[in-house]
From Swiss-Prot:
Pfam family, one: Antimicrobial_2
InterPro entries attached to this UniProt entry: Antimicrobial_frog_2, Frog_antimicrobial_propeptide
Residues of the signal peptide: 1-22
Propeptide: 23-42
Tissue: Expressed by the skin glands.
Disulphide-bonded residues: 68-74
Predominant place of localization: secreted
Location of the protein in the cell: Secreted
Physiological role: Antimicrobial peptide.
Assigned protein family: Belongs to the frog skin active peptide (FSAP) family. Brevinin subfamily.
Keywords: Amphibian defense peptide, Antimicrobial, Cleavage on pair of basic residues, Disulfide bond, Secreted, Signal
UniProt-listed GO biological process terms: defense response
Annotated protein name in UniProt: Pelophylaxin-2
Length: 74
């Protein structure tokens, strides 16, 4: 069970890094293109916000479970 949680946290960490790199690239592209926003970028932004929200919720749940196991009471 611990190995599974460890791998989930690892994937969460990698996903966070990938999202930050994508945001940096998009920021650089906007500076070059005069900050034009297309429908595709809007959809991508909605998807990224949804993924970020889900990742925050998963992290919160994992931290709550970890806190329960450490303190011994839930």
């Amino acid at each position: 069970m611990f190995t599974m949680k460890k791998s989930l946290l690892f994937f969460f960490f990698l996903g966070t890094i990938a999202l930050s790199l994508c945001e940096e690239e998009r920021g650089a592209d906007e500076e070059e293109n005069g900050a034009e926003i297309t429908d595709e970028e809007v959809k991508r932004g909605i998807l990224l916000n949804t993924l970020k929200g889900a990742a925050k919720n998963v992290a919160g749940v994992l931290l709550d479970k970890l806190k329960c196991k450490i303190t011994g009471g839930c």
